[in-house]
Amino acid sequence: MDGKPLNEAQCAVIDRHFDRFGRSEHSRLRIDEKQSSVYNPCTARLHVHKHDRRLSGKQELVFDSAAGRATSLTSHTLKLWDRRRHASAREYARIQGFPESFVLPRQLVANLFGNAVAVPCALHACRSVVGSDGAAPGTLLDLCAGIGGFHLAAQMAFPRIRCVGFCDVKPAAVQCYKENFPDVPALGDITAVQEWPRADLLTAGFPCQPFSRACDIKVRAVHKDRLFYEHVFDAIDAARPNYVVLENVRSLACPTGKPQLDAILNAFRDRGYHTNHRILDAADFGLPQQRFRIYIVARLDGSVEVPPAPSCARTTLGDILEDAEDAVHTDPQF
């Protein structure tokens, strides 16, 4: 197994601060995926549960059976853990592939990073949509931008790119984006923008509530008729980008979400775009979490594909977490 296991101090931190959640389904720690053994830190015993879709849909801290230590975090478990341990912003940055110099607010760090796009996955998608034969985009329009994961990925892929505007409705995310990218115009709520700037590349991690397993049935019903992606296509019609990259939860490709996926792909084709899509796992790009997301890429001037993830050494939480005494908030914050 690649990656460094957690040391005793780090394990103690996780055990101590997960005890309060030990009886909750959300805190069950899965040790062996094949046998679906679950470790409960409250009782320190192994419990074997039938591993079905309902259990796999829960937010869990995944363990590697060989190393016996945590190898990945999902965003919900990350938020639970942060309530007790107060992770440093540096640790969050490492988990999602952000630079450690990224400036963050003093509050809502877990929430902002939990909802952020994994930068290495976004980078792979941005490079894929242009391919080896496409002209590098000079301008970016960043929709449903969060704290700027797609912006970072686009800058890594195309160093000369300039972002002409971003959209998000969460005040903390907008503030964080502006702190890190002060020259980019904030366009406000995507549903209320009247005039869109032209751009070569458009990215959007549009809301996933209607398709997410973590979303409750009532919430799905509320979102059923909203068709939020139609607002993204309003921007596409106005900006007319040559390249588009969309990100969402992998459930969009499951039977319940497939009608929406088909509608999105057909909307691209009706506009003359060539499309492709692939589910990517953040762990395959060296991040210490299993985070599956679907990336939809579209291109006007040629065919497009998203290659499989490159071979990469797996990273464990032991590689990125600091000991409790070192995990102080000395990070760049506002």
Describe the role of every protein-language-model region.
Residues 1-164, 169, 174-178, 267-271, ...:
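S-adenosyl-L-methionine-dependent DNA methyltransferase catalytic core
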Residues 1, 168, 227-299:
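Conserved Class I SAM-dependent methyltransferase catalytic core
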Residues 133-243, 250-262:
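Core alpha/beta nucleotide-donor-binding catalytic domains of modification enzymes
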Residues 55-58, 187-190, 279-282:
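Short alpha-helical segments and helix-capping/turn motifs at coil-helix boundaries
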Residues 116, 195-199, 286-290:
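Short, solvent-exposed polar/charged micro-motifs at secondary-structure junctions
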Residues 78, 100, 191, 282-285:
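Residues that form or immediately flank small-molecule/cofactor binding pockets and catalytic motifs
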Residues 99, 118-119, 206-207, 241, ...:
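Proline-centered helix-kink/hinge sites
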Residues 109-113, 220, 252, 284:
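Conserved short-loop catalytic and cofactor-binding motifs
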